[in-house]
Amino acid sequence: MAAKGGTVKAASGFNAAEDAQTLRKAMKGLGTDEDAIINVLAYRSTAQRQEIRTAYKTTIGRDLMDDLKSELSGNFEQVILGMMTPTVLYDVQELRKAMKGAGTDEGCLIEILASRTPEEIRRINQTYQLQYGRSLEDDIRSDTSFMFQRVLVSLSAGGRDESNYLDDALMRQDAQDLYEAGEKKWGTDEVKFLTVLCSRNRNHLLHVFDEYKRIAQKDIEQSIKSETSGSFEDALLAIVKCMRNKSAYFAERLYKSMKGLGTDDDTLIRVMVSRAEIDMLDIRANFKRLYGKSLYSFIKGDTSGDYRKVLLILCGGDD
């Protein structure tokens, strides 16, 4: 499939000061005009939302984020505040939230660190340090352990080869090494999996996966499932999935956040907010292909109220 891109585009005829006034009016006095807030913010790009925030402060003398926080609540508030947060800072806040307090949201750590580009990871590291006065790596170390910790530390280094270069000999060697590290012996050399999956470029890895299948007579995903377990397994699978088809990986994250009883709203919100401008159309196409139903219909059936309204706009239509 050719990449289709995002659903949220910059609005034409954009006037930040006008939008700021509309938002103030929606929140002033008794009650809140949620529709007015949705109609402005859901139809603006992240960059435009930042301009609105500046215009709001300049022309009204109040902070838009603070006003939204005091007027809105629940999941609707969470989506709107997420949309108002600059992209890298949003990732940083989500990573922090995943590690703060008791318990760890391993899924969130894996999702962000396995799917972002090395350049994005480097920016995440800088912003995390500025925001919290300590490094992302230190927080990962204090919150996770064993091989799972090691794979996250490795991903958080942002050191993956970004070229398209394919060294045929190294590619064959990697495939052979992975085979020997797992399927071929009793016990698993987990570090080998980590080294290859966390440092090689995408083009190289796609060839490694093909060669691996030829040698092992099975997909690398099958081997990862039988050779590793727990969060370490989840992380390796996420890396492979993101290399093969990142939009399909996010489609699966969305599907799992909604299928069955209850909804994992944190994941649903994070993926919808962070992918709306990047590859939401591709995620939708993959969702339909994988699950036979549209993402739109899933969101519609799983959410309600203003929360549902804004998610459906980010989704951008039915398939």
Swiss-Prot record:
Where are the N-acetylalanine residues found in this chain? 2
Query: Which SMART domains did the record assign?
Result: ANX (SM00335)
Subcellular location as annotated = Zymogen granule membrane
Q: Where are the Annexin repeats?
A: 14-85, 86-157, 169-241, 245-316
Modification Phosphoserine occurs at: 12
State the Gene Ontology terms under molecular function. calcium ion binding; calcium-dependent phospholipid binding; carbohydrate binding; chondroitin sulfate binding; heparin binding; phosphatidylserine binding
Keyword Phosphoprotein in the entry? The reply is yes
Phosphothreonine sites (modified residues)? 7
What keywords does the record list, in alphabetical order? Acetylation, Annexin, Calcium, Calcium/phospholipid-binding, Cytoplasmic vesicle, Membrane, Phosphoprotein, Repeat
Pfam families in UniProt: Annexin
Chief site of localization? membrane
How does this protein lie in the membrane? Answer: Peripheral membrane protein
What is this protein's function? May play a role in alveolar type II cells through interaction with the surfactant protein SFTPA1 (SP-A).
Q: Beyond the main fields, what else does the record say?
A: Seems to bind one calcium ion with high affinity.
Give the family per the record. Belongs to the annexin family.
The domain section of the record reads: A pair of annexin repeats may form one binding site for calcium and phospholipid.
The protein in question is named: Annexin A4
